[in-house]
Structures are given as C-alpha cells and as structure tokens.
Amino acid sequence: MRSNALVLAVVCSLLAVGLGTIGSTPVFALESPAVQSGNVTEAEIETETETGTKNHSAIIKVYPNLPVPQNRGEYVVVTLAQPGNWTLTDGVSTVSLPRNHTGPIAVTRDPHLTQNITRYPVYETASRFRLSQDGETLTLKRDGKMVDKIAYNRATEGDRWHRNASQQWIPEGLTLRETVNTGPATVETFVLPDTPAQPIEPITTATDRVHIGAYTFESWTAAKALVEAHDRGANVSVLVDGNPVGGVSEQQKSVLDTLVAEGVTVHVLGGDRSRFRFHHPKYAIADDNAVVLTENWKPAGTGGKESRGWGVRIENNRTANELYTVYRHDTGWKDTVSWETYRTQIDTTEQPVAAGEFETAHRAKKHTADQVSVLTAPGNAEDAVVKMLRSAEDEVLIMQPQLASPQQRMVRAAVAAAKRGVDVKILLSDAWYSNEENSAIAAHMNRQADAGNYPLAVRVDEPNGRYGKIHAKGLVVDNTTIVGSLNWNDNSARENREVAVQIESAEVATYYRSVFAADWQTDKHDERTVRYVEGGVLILIGLIAIGTIAYAHRSIIFAE
C-alpha cells in the first residue's frame, strides 16, 4: 500500500496542482408601495457579458435548500432596474413584485427569518411561492413579457445559487468577498528561486502576529521562523489544505507535528462539507506586513530549490488586516479542524523533496505602489483579471504553469486584447507532465493569431538551468501587476480558495517585465517556432493528453 501511495503521490504532485452580514433588514408586506434599497454593492447586482458589465433587471440569487426544517426562510433575490408591473414565476405560482421599487429585493414567504440571513431588503409574498430543492426554472417578467430567466439544478443543503459570470453555487459557510483596495504602499518584489530569504524575512522580525494561509506547508526554514516568532510572544498559526493532490507528505506531517509541539496553532481545512475544492493560497501576515506568493511553502517553492515563482512583500497594515479577515473567515467554520485531530485520520505518503541549486539573477527590490488591492477566489479574482485585460492598451504579459483551455474566460479576454492590437505574450511551463498539452495549446493559439494577424505569442518555457520549471501565476498589464495563487482555469477561479494582489505601480510592472523578458529568452528557437508544429505531432500530443495523462491532468490542473 505504501509503494502504491508513493507512486501516486510522486505523479500527482508533479502533475498538480453570501450570505450577507447578519442584521436587521426592513421587511415589507405585499401591500407596501415601495421597498427601500439595502446595502448591496454593484458587484452583487451585475452580470458579466462578453462586452462588459451592465446593470439590468435580473434574478441574481437563489437560496432554495436551507439547513432548517421545511426550508423556512428560503428566498430568491431579483434586482429591478425600473418601476413597473413586475412578476416572478416558477411556472406554477406567480409573485407580484412592488410596482415602484428599483434595486435588489429578497422575495420570501418567511420575512422574519430571511431578514436574519441576508443583507437585502426583504419582501413578503402572500402567495404559496416555494423554491424547489431539485431545481427549476424561474422567470422574471415585466408587463407579462420575459425579462430574465434562470434554471438551476439540484441544490445541496446550504448552497446558494449566485448570478455571476460562472452562475455558480456558493457553499454554506462561504461569503464571497469584494475586491478590497488597501491604498498606497511600499512593495518589495522578488522572484524564486533567486531570493528564498524574502518570504521568510518578515516572519523573523514579527512580534505581534504571524498567520500563514497555505496549500501545503513543508518548509523547515519557515517552520523555524514561526517557532521563533511564537517564542517572542507573537500569535502564530497556520492553515493548510486537508486533501492536497498526492496526499499529505511525510515531511509535512513532521513539520506540522513540530509546530504543534512548539505551541504553534495549525488548522486544516477539508472534508465532505469543505467550502473549497482546494485551499490553495500562499500568503503570510507578519505584524503589518503581507506576503503574497505564487509558490507553496516547501523547498521547491519558497525554499528556492526548483520553481520559478513571483512574490511580493507589502508594507501596509490595511493589506495585512484584509488578509487576516480572509484568514479568520477561512478558519472559522466547521470544515476547519485542528492538525492534532486531522492527523489521526490520514495516511501520509513519501514524496520527493526538491534540492536544486540556482544562481541569483534577479534581486529583491522595493518600490512605491499607488494602489494595492486584495483579490480572492471564489468571488472577485477572475472578474478582476478580466477587467484588467479589457483595459489593456499596450502590453500584456502572462506567466502560468498551464492554460486549461483557449475558451477559459481569462484566456478569451487576453486574446480579445490582442485582437485590439495589444501586444500579448504568454509563457507556459515545460514541466514533463504539462509540456505536451502546453505545446498543443500554444500551437493552436499561435496559429489562430497568425491567421487573424494579431500580436499574440504563446511559448513553452525553456529554463536552461535558471530554475527547474515555471510555477508562477503572474500577470502584467501596462503598469498594473497581479501576483498570487490563481491558476487560469475554472476550478481555480470558482472552486478553490485563491489569494492574489493587484498592484498599480509602474515600478513593480517594470520589475516583473524584466523578469518575464529574461525568462522569455531561449537559445534554441525564435518566438514563432511553436507556431509551425506539424499536424501529425499535434495528433500525437492530443492522444497522449487524452490517454496517458488524462486523469492526472484533471486532478492537477486545479491545484498546482
């Protein structure tokens, strides 16, 4: 059993990867002439389209399967752009809505219960309007004519259907966050494997608090810094994913056991009711510093022993506090348990430990940023990336381990920028488990760019001894940069917990532009080589992708 687990761990590891504020909300009966607007942000009442974001009348939320008897308090939220003769129907029952109301409204049979679980103004219907747990179609009409229609499938208990670009179900216990602007800041930029001391350095001086949000935590160097911070009197804790691809490594078990023995709190997020497919961020809060990374807390990542990664240290207490708010949310529900409890329920796997040695080509550098924004997934990160790409004027640089599909929403936005005349470059990993698929997608996108005569180039990386493989998830658009854990696939954007920062700074963009340019260089080919892969090779690539690595790809593309 151990040998099988070892094989699976090695292969998978290499191939991998709301409810509103509770409070008092006005309740209005059917006869009420108007309903006052609640405290709802634009992001919650907008629907993404391919051409932009528009306010319009729509069904925006459905909560049909509450974890209470008879689903009392169930509701559907609609937003109305103008007064009128509005109705909502499921094909069996029809609800008349307030004629003079504009804005969002939660329609319910049980207003006094609903007002405690939503921030929206609540509207009591006198009809026997009930939402189906098994799924149904809801239609919003004005003067008897359809304005919007949605169909939802079977609802898991506690999940809410949320109207956004992905029209996703939001698990119980998860509050979708808005993008939070935390103001100007001093930002230190660095890359890995060049400067492995940088992610750890803020921890070594912390005296008040250190909290780490991680996918995995296997770094003895970071663990030592955490224990020393704890000994200095700081409040120290770690949150890791409970079911990483390949399993929990023996090294991680040893590291976490040591942390707990030394008094550090370790949380594990997972289980059948997990709010996320993977808890996948890589960040640290150290006093008033925030560290946000593309790399995992292990030798191959923060240890500088293998992967090309990007990272930033942000000297700004508002950024640190916002990350701590995310951390408290993620550690504060029933899908999170202590490491002491969790470790008794799992078997560990032997996994290889990276031990590469690389020269320092890029040193850390401090800059001034005009604005820093904290992005999270699920919720706002994908929208922020798409919005940024839509605003591109001159240049887009994308570094990713893999692209799931040319049809992924962020990828489509990058292609659309190129079609507007923006110079777009995409650099993908050459890791053995993704090289063939990345080569195929690069060839496809490059051929499309050639045929359409727009400035897009996609290349599979050639590290040439500078690092082991690309693991960075970085984006530069003109003078704005995004650094974080977000992979460009639907599961990362919509199912995983991801954390990134968006930095408005010409200096930061210039730093990563220089790193990207150096990594883009190759000794073997010019940038168009991958455009002319023979059809037979592409067929072979497709067969390999479908056959030998299909399972691993499905698992890992979501969690690298």
Region spans (language model):
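Short, aromatic-rich amphipathic segments at membrane interfaces
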Residues: 502, 506-534
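Solvent-exposed beta-edge/loop recognition patches
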Residues: 68-74, 94-163, 472
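Glycine-centered short loops/turns at secondary-structure junctions
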Residues: 233, 421-422
